Design a protein with these regions (language model features):
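Basic, Lys/Arg-enriched alpha-helical interface segments
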Residues: 1-67, 76-82, 87, 91-95
Length: 95
């Protein structure tokens, strides 16, 4: 088993979004797989369309878990912390 590079932190908003995703019966294992890759410092597959955000979310990154299910996260390099900020649809996060 690979050792993680980053300590994973969850925001209160992410915890709430995670519970909402569970209630919607979204495939949580896909989210967990992405979190695992990020925690190990591995690049995400191209299908996840990982990219930097701008505007209010500058300093954060976004990737697609599914076409309209996103994960917003931030990597704080100095302290090696992966902060999971939000998860949800485009409309929920940016609408």
């Amino acid at each position: 088993m690979s050792e993680t590079k980053y300590t994973v932190k969850f925001t209160a908003a992410f915890r709430k979004d995670y519970k909402k995703a569970q209630k919607r019966r979204l495939p949580i294992e896909k989210l967990q797989e992405i979190i695992g890759l990020l925690a190990m410092g591995e690049p995400l597959p191209e299908r996840n369309r990982d990219h930097a955000l701008t505007g209010d979310w500058v300093g954060h990154r976004e990737c697609h878990i599914q076409p309209d299910w996103l994960l917003i996260y931030r990597i704080e390099g100095d302290v090696l912390v992966l902060t999971l900020a939000r998860t949800g649809t485009h409309g929920e996060l940016f609408g």
